[in-house]
Amino acid sequence: MENKKTIYFLCTGNSCRSQMAEAWGKKYLGDNWNVYSAGIEAHGVNPNAIKAMNEVNIDITNQTSDIIDANILNRADLVVTLCSHADSVCPSTPPDVNRVHWGFDDPAGKEWSEFQRVRDEIGERIKRFSETGE
């Protein structure tokens, strides 16, 4: 069944938040959605994001850090920006793209507990979306 919708998680560096969101998205939405993530820049997958997801038995070592792909962006059924208010640069999207904003703090460079907190918050948000469509 290839009539899947496409969801595209975006943040600044495609290093932490959008990587975790992609993994949670594949877990909770993978049956009905093609799940992608990207950033304005590609900073590489943060080792602590990999470690945090491993704690919940999700392996993201094969995910790549990617710059926003206009083809995916323009055909996505839903674009989700994950930047916090503290981020000065959050990806902009074309006006015709269905975009929502789910803001999460950037754990990069912070305490380990921040990675765990943000991981859990993103997981809960995507789980709720999978159950309610909102």
Swiss-Prot record:
General function of this protein: Catalyzes the reduction of arsenate [As(V)] to arsenite [As(III)].
Active site annotation, chain numbering: C11, C83, C90
Organism: Bacillus cereus (strain AH187)
GO MF annotation terms: arsenate reductase (thioredoxin) activity; protein tyrosine phosphatase activity
Protein name, as recorded: Arsenate reductase
GO cellular component, one term: cytoplasm
Keyword Cytoplasm recorded: yes
Alphabetical keyword list: Arsenical resistance, Cytoplasm, Disulfide bond, Oxidoreductase, Redox-active center
Cysteines paired by S-S bonds: C11-C83, C83-C90
A Pfam family it matches: LMWPc
Catalysed reactions, as listed in the record: arsenate + [thioredoxin]-dithiol + H(+) = arsenite + [thioredoxin]-disulfide + H2O
Annotated EC: 1.20.4.4
One GO term of the biological process aspect: response to arsenic-containing substance
Localization of this protein: Cytoplasm
Domain of life per record: Bacteria
Family: Belongs to the low molecular weight phosphotyrosine protein phosphatase family. Thioredoxin-coupled ArsC subfamily.
Coiled coil (residue ranges): none
Enzyme class name: oxidoreductase
